[in-house]
């Protein structure tokens, strides 16, 4: 943050600038020492994390890391303001995935794919407002092009979100698509999400348990493991009603009363896979010999046991 602020402070205004600034916070490992303004006895872990002594402590450490990130962003924004550049600058803050917690990061639940996206653009009505419409990270590039008056390359697949910046009630998408292939072990998943429903498909039927190496080590992971995480089952297909099941815990796939919805979403997902030539349709992604990939059964990503690693992918479902 200091280096980014220093660069802005030295900006001479002779030509437009682009500055990309990334932070380690809020990645694990979170700080062991909890900020004095955060009381671990009075924090509430977000769903799908249970409320317990262990998870509260873990989340308090996350909040300490998040506070550091907030202060760093504030340092940069304050420097823009001091230089008189705020009203001439497009500001975008985002993250790449959900919290590094079980059932969050490296999943296609909303707790895994729902991320922060803050955009402030000069003169836009939505500045300072929450916009509820669906947006994908694919939309960032065309949005910036429109805001800056730059011609959009023809290969872009995203949709400009400028209409949402002009009108917080505007919608630019009926659906978004998301995927997982690897974190440390192979776990191919695809989904389609609309405002009301989400349909998820797991493509590795050979292992329908939780890929534990794809979950970062933490007090929260320990809490789940002590209560049977290894025995938890994954569905090959899942359908969730995001209005009446915000936590995505009641799988509606296969229920006759939701058959029409499931069939329609599955067809839309299949069409997307064809249009994007997704390799999952032809057996998945092969692991090259030089890659280091955890076995699906491995419990920790940092295992020192050579038997916990593989160099081949087995048992993928093929879809047309």
Name each model-derived stretch.
Residues 1-46, 81-90, 102, 175, ...:
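Active-site regions of oxyanion-processing enzymes, predominantly non-cytosolic
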Residues 15-54, 197-227, 292-316:
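Core domains of carbohydrate- and sulfate-ester-processing enzymes
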């Amino acid at each position: 943050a200091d280096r980014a602020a220093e660069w802005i402070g030295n900006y001479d205004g002779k030509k437009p600038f682009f500055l990309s600034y990334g932070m380690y916070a809020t990645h694990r490992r979170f700080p062991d020492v909890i900020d004095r303004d955060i009381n671990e006895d009075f924090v509430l872990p977000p769903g799908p994390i249970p409320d317990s002594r262990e998870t509260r402590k873990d989340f308090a450490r996350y909040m300490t890391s998040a506070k550091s990130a907030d202060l760093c962003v504030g340092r940069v924004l304050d420097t823009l303001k001091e230089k008189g550049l705020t009203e001439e600058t497009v500001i975008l803050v985002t993250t790449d995935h959900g919290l590094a917690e079980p059932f969050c990061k490296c999943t296609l639940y909303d707790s895994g794919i729902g991320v922060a996206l803050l955009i402030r653009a000069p003169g836009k009505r939505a500045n300072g407002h929450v916009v509820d419409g669906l947006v994908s990270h694919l939309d960032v590039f065309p949005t910036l092009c429109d805001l800056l008056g730059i011609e959009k390359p023809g290969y872009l697949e995203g949709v400009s979100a400028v209409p949402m910046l002009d009108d917080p009630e505007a919608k630019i998408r009926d659906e978004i698509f998301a995927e997982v292939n690897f974190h440390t072990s192979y776990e191919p998943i695809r989904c389609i999400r609309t405002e009301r429903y989400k349909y998820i498909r797991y493509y590795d039927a050979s292992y329908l348990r939780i890929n534990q190496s794809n979950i970062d080590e933490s007090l929260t992971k320990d809490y789940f493991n002590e209560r049977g995480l290894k025995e938890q089952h994954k569905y090959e297909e899942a359908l969730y009603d995001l209005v009446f099941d915000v936590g995505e815990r009641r799988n509606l796939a296969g229920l006759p009363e939701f058959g029409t919805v499931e069939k329609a979403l599955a067809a839309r997902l299949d069409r997307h896979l064809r249009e994007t030539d997704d390799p999952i349709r032809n057996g998945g992604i092969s692991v090259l010999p030089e890659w280091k990939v955890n076995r699906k059964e491995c419990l920790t990503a940092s295992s020192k046991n050579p038997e916990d690693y593989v160099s081949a992918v087995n048992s993928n479902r093929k879809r047309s």
